[in-house]
């Protein structure tokens, strides 16, 4: 009997340790065996003998192809050279890179070494990069020569080793930096060094930064066990939830420094032996050309890219018929956009997933992507992944809710984070004593087990899928001598989804202008954190506790102020 025929609605009333009765939601797909005792790299390359000579990484702009054997060998060589450079087990390597094959090779090398990879947006300001590097105790940074000026103080003051991936001899490598090609050189003790590394499933392999439900960016500790579990939940089993296979060509235009691309494109693609087509940034004509030339079959996207494609007349010039899956994440996709995408990609299944960095990151995924698919509804962001539990709770009482009742989404399973780095208080606020991770998102599960996102409790602003923490911008703004109080909230915007706007209380007799405020922030942050609008106000609404009442400010925006 096929897995789909065996599958039944696996919602059940379950006795919890401390709750009289929790309504637990599970996947329609049966649980599977997950070998999460393996290190991440051993799991990823477990079946390499089946596709050693197949394309693994395709550099979109250059066309250069790395086979699976190439990637395996080079990653191990880099790991051995990490060891030579003094990177020890559990040390942190920062990847300050756009999408490129070197990102993948370096991430895997960190895993082989028993080190931890943290990734940062190369467009971050020097202060933003330094904050993450110091908080994570980064020992080595892999980047491009053009970004070295931003991180020179880390080299000079903290002894951080800098490696540049530029392989063109015409590009001079800044003084004191190493070339990436030096790390890829074979070393006689490579196998001995790497094979002697003993990795615990609970060791941290990835350290993405996330603001969580509130506050400033924090290091999210994702373990070997957690990432193996998350990837397996998606692509393993006789009827995988996300059906990737070794003949697929998977587009990777979403930033690899974001957990969505790192996990659901890079790691999932590697696990099944697919070819991963890497684009350093979104350029619609190049993207369409590469889809046609490389016969891309899977196109993971975020709503702003979906919107750009939906509105573009350029699509008519290209053959996009090879695409069988369009997967959207990072923010809900509306019905109009769904219809537009279906028109542009006539042979593609369109569906959504729902994730959060702290959850590993995937909580739910469309069962329309399964090898033996289930019917799905427009607007749903999937069904809870297998080998995990989900519940919906009343945000005020914490009581478990049943179907069709909106509440806070909670997830439990081996895939969730170990915790926030050096922040037990924030960890305890996010993961309760029974192991449930509280997302800060409001959703409901309907009669067909499909999850719908209704609202957001958390303060986070999502600009084209990027996280913007209001608290981070407020901390900057309150440092301005002419600002006495401030609150930052999200405002809806078609192209970006959401943009940050500031409500500002000026000091008495100040002549502070909107442009003054915008420029003050823009000099200190990456482009997507810039303030879009400034509203001057007499006071900021606050609860008796002093907490900003953001919902009141969002209501003002919704009512046109």
UniProtKB/Swiss-Prot annotation:
ATP binds at residues 210-214, 218, 352-353, 357, 441, 456, 547. CoA binds at residues 281, 464-465. (E)-4-coumaroyl-AMP binds at residues 260, 264, 330, 352-353, 357, 365, 458, 462. Its cofactor is Mg(2+). Preferentially expressed in roots, bolting stems and siliques. Also detected in leaves. The keyword ATP-binding applies. This is 4-coumarate--CoA ligase 1. It comes from Arabidopsis thaliana.
